[in-house]
Amino acid sequence: MGLDHRLVSSKRGTVIEWRKANQIHGWFDHQLGGVKNITRYPVKIKQLEFLLDDCIRVKEDLIAGGMKNFEQVTESGIKDGEHYEKKEMVPMFVNVTLAKELLPPTPGFFFGGYEFDEWYLKQIDETIEKLMEILSTKQKGERFYYDAWW
């Protein structure tokens, strides 16, 4: 359950699969004028190049700004009739202005976290790696499509 999404090639089948990478889904949602559940959308090569560029810019900016530990509620509930919260120090990126502009976390039902943390960067890293491979090995007449289900 949650956000699953992918990029599909007309020649190679599924070339990227994401799980709860809501910032990437939000990017496609914005670029494609809205994305409906279980609907396939054509994606232009130029759009994939723009996504790659945005991912690289955000990654470089996050790394340049560094990380800092922030207190975050990791668990809450009722115990012995009293409300409680468990808090932990969690490393998060400090300079997130560009990330908020280009690849902001996108809310949705079970879409994953909204923090600018190591998981956020890992999803961007994986997207960069896959897009570089896809774009460098593009085949003649190959078309790409994006779909998501949640």
Residue ranges and their predicted role:
Residues 1-150:
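Acidic (Asp/Glu-rich) sequence patches and key acidic residues
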